[in-house]
């Protein structure tokens, strides 16, 4: 006696469910956009390791790829990627995947600050170079080892990520296809 069509179908469903729950999660891409003062903005892309996607808070150690591009009035002024990191590069990142939030507003180096190729003084991004900092004084950018005061905004301004890319003016773009 062979299996009935219903039994085969049920077995397929059970196997599919088992595979779905035992198949490891894949890495996830997140998109970043920041609007500063005086026409400064930043877009970026971050990839988290599969093991980090479900964590409450991830750090720079969980990031497998990262790139930011800086703009002034929509014109590219610089960029930085994790591939350019050296032993002297400032690289501090905190991110909450569930809320798509980068914690900001705290002392530099704390759990609520960011340093993407820019330290707390925003003066170590390289020459040529570009970086972003969020601490307790402001959120701002560094260009060619120089703090760009004009870019500064309130340190508590929310910094969110998206699952879709942003345009230069921080409008989420709907992927085609």
Where in this protein do the model-derived segments appear?
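Absolute protein N-terminus
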Residues: 1, 27-28
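Bacterial N-terminal signal peptides that target proteins for export
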Residues: 1-11
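N-terminal start-of-chain detector that recognizes signal peptides
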Residues: 5, 17, 39-41
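Bacterial N-terminal signal peptides
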Residues: 10-20
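Sec/Tat signal peptide C-region and signal peptidase I cleavage site
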Residues: 21-27
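An extracellular/secretory-lumen and virion-surface interaction module
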Residues: 28-177
């Amino acid at each position: 006696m062979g299996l009935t069509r219903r039994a085969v179908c049920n077995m397929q469903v059970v196997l599919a469910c088992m595979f779905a729950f035992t198949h490891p999660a894949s890495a996830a891409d997140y998109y970043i956009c920041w609007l500063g003062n005086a026409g400064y903005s930043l877009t970026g892309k971050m990839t988290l390791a599969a093991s980090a996607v479900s964590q409450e808070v991830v750090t720079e150690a969980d990031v497998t790829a990262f790139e930011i591009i800086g703009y002034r009035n929509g014109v590219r002024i610089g960029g930085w990627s994790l591939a350019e990191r050296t032993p002297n590069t400032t690289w501090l990142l905190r991110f909450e995947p569930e809320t798509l939030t980068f914690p900001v507003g705290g002392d530099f180096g704390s759990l609520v600050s960011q340093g993407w190729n820019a330290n707390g003084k925003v003066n170590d991004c390289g020459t040529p170079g570009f970086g972003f900092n969020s601490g307790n004084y402001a959120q701002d950018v560094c260009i060619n080892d120089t703090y760009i005061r004009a870019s500064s905004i309130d340190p508590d301004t929310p910094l969110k990520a998206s699952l879709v890319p942003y345009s230069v003016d921080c409008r989420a773009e709907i992927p085609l296809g």
